[in-house]
Curated annotation (Swiss-Prot):
Name of the gene this protein is made from: GPC
Protein name: Pre-glycoprotein polyprotein GP complex
Lineage of the organism: Viruses, Riboviria, Orthornavirae, Negarnaviricota, Polyploviricotina
Binding sites annotated in the UniProt record for Zn(2+) 1: C57, H462, C470, C472
Cytoplasmic side: 33, 449-488
Membrane-spanning intervals of the chain: 18-32, 34-53, 428-448
Keyword Zinc on entry: yes
Amino acid sequence: MGQLFSFFEEVPNIIHEAINIALIAVSLIAALKGMINLWKSGLFQLIFFLTLAGRSCSFRIGRSTELQNITFDMLKVFEDHPTSCMVNHSTYYVHENKNATWCLEVSVTDVTLLMAEHDRQVLNNLSNCVHPAVEHRSRMVGLLEWIFRALKYDFNHDPTPLCQKQTSTVNETRVQINITEGFGSHGFEDTILQRLGVLFGSRIAFSNIQDLGKKRFLLIRNSTWKNQCEMNHVNSMHLMLANAGRSSGSRRPLGIFSWTITDAVGNDMPGGYCLERWMLVTSDLKCFGNTALAKCNLDHDSEFCDMLKLFEFNKKAIETLNDNTKNKVNLLTHSINALISDNLLMKNRLKELLNTPYCNYTKFWYVNHTASGEHSLPRCWLVRNNSYLNESEFRNDWIIESDHLLSEMLNKEYIDRQGKTPLTLVDICFWSTLFFTTTLFLHLVGFPTHRHIRGEPCPLPHRLNSRGGCRCGKYPELKKPITWHKNH
């Protein structure tokens, strides 16, 4: 009953909107009929012919949709990250960031610069390879570690690298790896060249390696950045994603002259501590942290102290467990995201190798509805042979995206219209339509209303029996044939 009252309160608004819908429907029907007549008359065909004859026709979908795109300058995004580029298909340069004046040069050569008899071997510690007098030493060591991790270098099984011997006169950073076939390096040359191609994104890298000697080395050394080549943001993404799963734990510095109980990473264990200062005849006790527990640590003969320690330890242990669990989950999430991103980049690299269109995550296209301002989700503008595809090469994708956009807009509009119609009005419309259909069927079938003497006028208001006589007995039975009639 309350729903019915609410419906009657909204009747003026419903009638007003229904009238508008009816007017729009009549207008659309009239306009559509007029357009059909004009189309059948051939007027539109003549105008189109005179307008388009001798001119090029651009392809459009609908009246309010057009193809638009957006381009990102990814080098601006990676200004503070390491970027790389290639020179002459044989030398790579890794630039630390936009403002750095130095870089690392990665190349393959047959010239022996370092000897195992004179230079030091690297045993999983690249910091010994950088001279202490080199400016930005810590950042250079970090970039070296990034490159080795990106190449998936195993210090235990792969050939041992050699570092430049540090002297007072030579402060150049050089790291040399023997990649030729030999003891401990079987198949390493093909593996490291393939990893370099994947990391720096070039299938034609080191194409002249066959011209070198039988003994070849991978050489990494520092150099001055002089804009030797143009940076590629895709290589920067490869370098960062290869190091995405890297995490390092740090230990915070503790007080030098303090006595406390800590775990492996420097976090305070549950409880407190006390310092006792002795004088000639007396002593002074000063407690820190949890004072009650600290005094219990000093004198733990009471059961209350044992229970207090247990409660405090359990509380701190649960907090430590929660923190460690959150850190592990975050690390796992970052690693999975890095693997997914690296998988996408590898798919694009395979597409480049097969000479098929691929995405370089720079330019994106989308369909914009200029009338409503709505647009589809951006999609990557594919690249083939270092150039973006022509619009005609993915016109089918554009058409499908436009259809999806229009369908989504129509569906949203339909849901909005459905929300403005009260449920009571729908029920009344349904039952009234059902009632109208039922009465229409009954009207078409019809029911006989009275008897009629065949061939004579209607005897109303008298009712006849089966023998043609009046039921009231006023008139005698005529014994004439009768029939049923619906109308008078």
